[in-house]
Amino acid sequence: TMAAIEEMEKVFRAEGIETEVIQVGGKPIADCLQCNVCGKTGKCVFTDDGVNEFVEKAKDADGFVFATPVYFAHPSGRIFDFLDRAFYSSNGYENFKFKPGAAVAIARRGGTTASLDALNKYFGIAQMPTAGSTYWNMVHGLTAEDAPKDEEGMQTMRNLAKNMIWMMRCFEAGKKAGVPYPDTEKQFCTNFIR
């Protein structure tokens, strides 16, 4: 996973874009309990795994890349738990709204497209434009040493970074030109069972 991120970072650095990598794979991440404490306090009730710090940093970020290894044909459980809590506790997605997002999946063989689909759901519900590349945002390899050998995958990461840069610059140019964001209607909350 880091090989793909590092390939993108090279492009970001070359274009003067600051990045920060936050790894969640090496520590336990609690899942969202939907206790709604964050709705009252603005912070998740769990405070020891970096989610609240990430949500705070997200306010100032211009774009996001969420990358995951693929386990059993889906993203890692940790990234799901992290993103569920980050998005749920971020004040109606305000920290993410109208900022480009990209999902990246790394696998030995299968499950990458299902993983990308799952991660892209976060972007859709938060009104985030989704960045794509010249192929699906995936790299293949069993080990970190294998990933750079996936020439098409590495090229896809470089092009993805270029597309993210372009999108972020377009949004910045729009702000400077006075183009307002859409006036989103207040969301209705409808249950299927009445």
Segments predicted by a language model, with ranges:
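A short beta-strand-loop structural module common to alpha/beta enzyme folds
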Residues: I17-K27
